[in-house]
């Protein structure tokens, strides 16, 4: 009688040593185990709790798949980045004019008000810059994770 792969329930003549289990749990196709590991993202056997010998491999950046499941979040991030970049550009463009305006005013109260407004605009621009960097880094880390796969090897 032939052995049966515990993942696909097909006939299997392979006996692989991916964990500490014995007998029927060693009967598994290598391709089935690869698919199961990449799907489940489990790092250890559910039964014997032995850690799998797994290597994470990343796809080359040029070959990344940029399709994301959560399109609303991705769209929100893109629109936020565009809005922030436009705001930052306008702040930089207008900052020189605002500085000249503040220094040209003789009234102390108006000068202080303009200085406060100018400072708030600049701080907002800096905050937007930090948020843009954080969102881009998060976006790239998520893409990197989605463009990776796990390779399992037998335990020696």
From Swiss-Prot:
Residues at which Zn(2+) 2 binds: 19, 21, 45, 48
Subcellular localization(s) per the UniProt record: Host membrane; Host Golgi apparatus, Host trans-Golgi network membrane; Host early endosome membrane
Stretches assigned to the Lumenal side: 95-111
Keywords of this entry: Host endosome, Host Golgi apparatus, Host membrane, Host-virus interaction, Inhibition of host adaptive immune response by virus, Inhibition of host MHC class I molecule presentation by virus, Membrane, Metal-binding, Modulation of host ubiquitin pathway by viral E3 ligase, Modulation of host ubiquitin pathway by virus, Transferase, Transmembrane, Transmembrane helix, Ubl conjugation pathway, Viral immunoevasion, Zinc, Zinc-finger
InterPro entries: Znf_RING-CH, Znf_RING/FYVE/PHD
GO (cellular component) term, any one: membrane
Similarity comment: Belongs to the poxviridae LAP protein family.
Name of the protein described by the UniProt record: E3 ubiquitin-protein ligase LAP
